[in-house]
Amino acid sequence: MSTIKLSLCLLIMLAVCCYEANASQICELVAHETISFLMKSEEELKKELEMYNAPPAAVEAKLEVKRCVDQMSNGDRLVVAETLVYIFLECGVKQWVETYYPEIDFYYDMN
């Protein structure tokens, strides 16, 4: 069941990022949230969520999915994060990626 939740989350992120009407206007916060969710620790994510004063049940639900994601190897999470960065580049946030993830530059040569 947890894999289904993760798959659904990733599909929703892809749909939001690549929907034609929003392609050039993707919110940098969505990109940050997505990559942070994959790569940060549970503790870092919890601190970030506290800034939004979300209901405890919502925070716990997100952390539960995070625990599922954290069962993936770091290498697998990096592959997913890099794939999402590629999608963000295609959706017009190249400047954001260059600013916050300068180490991920190998995708520029793919265009």
Curated annotation (Swiss-Prot):
It comes from the Eukaryota. Part of prostatein which is the major secretory glycoprotein of ventral prostate gland. Prostatein is composed of three different peptides called C1, C2 and C3. These form covalent C1:C3 (F) and C2:C3 (S) heterodimers whose noncovalent association forms tetrameric (C1:C3/C3:C2) prostatein molecules. The keyword Signal applies. This is Prostatic steroid-binding protein C1. Keywords: Lipid-binding, Secreted, Signal, Steroid-binding. It is found in: Secreted. The heterodimer can bind non-polar steroids, cholesterol and a group of small proline-rich peptides. It comes from Rattus norvegicus. Residues 1-23 form the signal peptide. InterPro entries: Secretoglobin, Secretoglobin_sf.
